[in-house]
From Swiss-Prot:
Topology relative to the membrane: Multi-pass membrane protein
Organism: Homo sapiens
Further information: The TMEM238L transcript is unstable, and this instability is partly mediated through a conserved region containing AU-rich sequences in the TMEM238L 3'UTR. Cancer cells lacking this conserved region display decreased proliferation and clonogenicity.
GO CC entries: endoplasmic reticulum membrane
Keywords: Endoplasmic reticulum, Membrane, Transmembrane, Transmembrane helix
Full protein name: Transmembrane protein 238-like
Chief place where the protein resides: endoplasmic reticulum
Locations listed in the record: Endoplasmic reticulum membrane
Primary role: May play a role in inducing apoptosis during endoplasmic reticulum (ER) stress and in the inhibition of proliferation and tumorigenicity.
Length: 79
């Protein structure tokens, strides 16, 4: 089974802290964004803008996590 072997070897990489923070901020930002859109609140704009800003910060953490997990062999670096 190809999927079974892939899921069995799944690991977060070298920077698990950035991964956990990015996932946490994704969840919080999405909840705030949906709360601002769907709930009948008088301060809906605060929730929408805050959720969008948190999702943007989460995107930065995803980029940092991905960049720190890139592996380049020493031969390609010409060291």
């Amino acid at each position: 089974m190809l999927l079974g072997s892939l899921w069995g070897r799944c690991h977060p990489g070298r920077c698990a802290l950035f991964l956990i923070l990015a996932l946490l901020l994704d969840a919080v930002g999405l909840v705030l964004l949906l709360l601002g859109i769907l709930a009948p609140l008088s301060s809906w704009d605060f929730f929408i803008y805050t959720g969008a800003l948190i999702l943007a910060l989460s995107l930065l953490l995803w980029i940092i996590w991905y960049s720190l997990n890139i592996e380049v062999s020493p031969e390609k670096l010409d060291l």
